[in-house]
Amino acid sequence: MSPIKAIKAAYFSPSGGTKRAAVLLCEQFGLPAEYIDCTCPPAKLPAAIPVAKDELLVLALPVYGGFGPRVEGLFSQLRGQGGPCVILAAYGNRDYENALAAAARQMKEQGFVCVGGIAPITPHVSAPSLGAGRPDEEDMPVFAAFARKVLAACENEPLRPAALPGDADAPRKPLRPTGRSRDKERCNHCGRCVRVCPAGALNELLEVDSEKCINCMACRFACPTYAWQFDTTAVRACLEENFSARRAVEWFAE
């Protein structure tokens, strides 16, 4: 097909780690890039976000329990025209499991051909020492090699989907419970947490819908008075004991 002229990067990044990884990857393509922040309830986004056939979609998401975020309608606005996309599944040094496969299938259903996938490591939201500082300088040559391979794959006619690991039909695991609480003395009721919650799990009374909450901690990161707290002591100890060894960035491209 004709050469790619630009990048469109759609990302979900409550803590900022996935966005940073997406920006670092997009810089490797050497093309103009437009960034679309999907870290909000899908209803707040345009009904349709078209992506031209000569644009490469970079879909960037964090991994929670082996899949992308469990947010109804996430990325559903993206509309492909048979053009290429790549999936970036950022994870906190444990495993990305089925995230690439599941996201690739969704994008196929929305009109894209997934020509590649990459799984960089970013700081774990519950155990920040895992993936601290990553992606780092050691990861950049890997990002560059992936970008070169993707651009070459985009010249195939027709485009060929990459073989990505994982099972899009695997059952989702329940999220590990965290001790979520709000310090009512610190809280000034500014409503910022309600506005930034990407899952729509907080109402105006600051009540949490536990069925919707994905433990992304966007509320905690956004709170100007540090009123929201998550007790991740047990989860952090388990992760640090079993998953502290540095993992390499893995990528796949046709």
Model-found features: residue ranges?
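Iron-sulfur cluster-binding cysteine motifs and their immediate structural context
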Residues: 182-183, 188-214, 218-235
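FMN-binding flavodoxin-like domain, especially the glycine-rich phosphate-binding loop
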Residues: 2-9, 13-40, 46-177, 231-254
